[in-house]
Regions:
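N-terminal leader/linker segments that precede catalytic domains of diphosphate-processing enzymes
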Residues: 1-80, 84-142, 157, 169-193
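Short, conserved loop/helix-junction motifs that constitute active-site signature segments
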Residues: 145-146
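Amphipathic alpha-helical interface segments
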Residues: 151
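A conserved hydrophobic position in a structured secondary element of the catalytic/binding core
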Residues: 154
Length: 193
């Protein structure tokens, strides 16, 4: 049990202040200049949970979902609740909150939005904006069984420890029809928690 980690010392206000710094818009400019077809807007909710010092895993934790093996895309992958923007969404926050409600039953009124991270372009031509929000915990989630197989949390302190991850270059074979900006990218691989 880690009680002196960084995540147990940073406050909600400090997280919000970090998110409000000038965002990197480089991914948006790459998206507009590198694709024939405009990227599709999407958003994910990055749900943060704060466990008090007397909890089993004190400090900040991130809530993840694991997709079912029956969904059309990204079968069995670990993800955040989210998806493609719908007309009428207050994009990106409204999209992230709507998707979180649909996938895990997280009511939008229960999420305190702290800010958002810069959008990033995916290999499938989505421009995804991560929206950061704090949720009360414990919370009675209602999992959409057609999309989500499970929900779990991982402490941020664990994720920050270098022995828990490695950074590798991801390379695709020349035969893969991959846009140039994805040919040789750095990927963070975490060991099993």
């Amino acid at each position: 049990m880690m009680t002196d980690g960084y995540s147990s010392k940073i406050s909600e206000i400090e997280i919000a202040n970090l998110l409000s710094l000038n965002p990197d818009t480089d991914s948006e400019s790459r998206a507009s200049s590198s694709n024939v077809q405009a990227p599709k807007p999407a958003a994910v909710l990055v749900p943060l949970i704060y466990d008090p010092p007397n909890a089993k895993n004190p400090g900040w934790q991130i809530l993840y979902t694991r997709r079912t093996d029956s969904v059309q895309d990204h079968k069995g992958q670990v993800s955040f609740p989210g998806g493609r923007a719908d007309p009428g969404d207050n994009y990106p926050t409204g999209t992230a909150l709507r998707e979180a409600y649909e996938e895990i039953g997280l009511r939008p009124s229960d999420v305190r939005i702290l800010g958002q991270m810069p959008p990033f372009l995916t290999i499938t031509n989505y421009l995804v904006t991560p929206v950061i929000g704090v949720i009360p915990w414990p919370y009675n989630l209602t999992i959409q069984p057609n999309e989500v197989s499970r929900v779990f949390t991982i402490p941020m302190d664990w994720m920050a420890k270098a022995e828990n991850y490695e950074i590798k270059q991801r390379k695709f074979p020349p035969s893969a029809q991959i846009p140039p900006q994805f040919q040789n990218i750095q990927v963070i691989y975490y060991r099993q928690y």
